[in-house]
Amino acid sequence: MKYSIIVPVFNRPDEVDELLESLLSQEEKDFEVIIVEDGSQIPCKEVCDKYADRLDLHYYNKDNSGPGQSRNYGAERAKGEYLLILDSDVVLPKGYIRAVSEELKREPADAFGGPDCAHDSFTDTQKAISYSMTSFFTTGGIRGGKKKLDKFYPR
């Protein structure tokens, strides 16, 4: 398996539904999805069950420990060669997995990231929030690739 898509979730079943729907539209299917429910009072298990026969989907429910620990929990259970860590509110565009694969063939990498963008279906309010969270003017260019911080040195 090439990719393990790890998604920590806290009280966001509607977002998970949209994310899983966007994963169905991917042409490249060499991935598993690991949903880590982080102590939610509004679980997304029923949403995950809807997709269980169409995606290689693994659902885990654990006590609340925050998104970082939940990402690690998912990573410990992942089988993929690469880990793609997404937030529950992500909607992937069609062709995303294929584009990642092509870029990794062209330029192998141990880690990568990218800018956020507002989906066409977003309301004006959602677009404004997205802009305030990702704009060069509000983040100083740290997000979106405008400013290179430094070389990464693993410990």
Name these PLM-found stretches.
Residues 95-127, 131:
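Conserved donor NDP-sugar-binding/catalytic core segment of glycosyltransferases
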Residues 20-61:
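Acidic donor-binding segment of Leloir-type glycosyltransferases
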Residues 87-91:
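The conserved acidic donor/metal-binding loop of glycosyltransferases
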Residues 1-25:
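N-proximal low-complexity "stem/linker" segments adjacent to membrane-targeting elements
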Residues 83:
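Short aromatic/hydrophobic "clamp" motif used to bind/position activated sugar donors
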Residues 9-17, 37, 41, 93-94:
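A structural helix-start
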Residues 62-78, 99:
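Glycine-rich, basic loop-to-helix element that forms the pyrophosphate-binding segment
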Residues 114-120, 129-154:
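Short, flexible, basic/aromatic active-site loop/helix in glycosyltransferases
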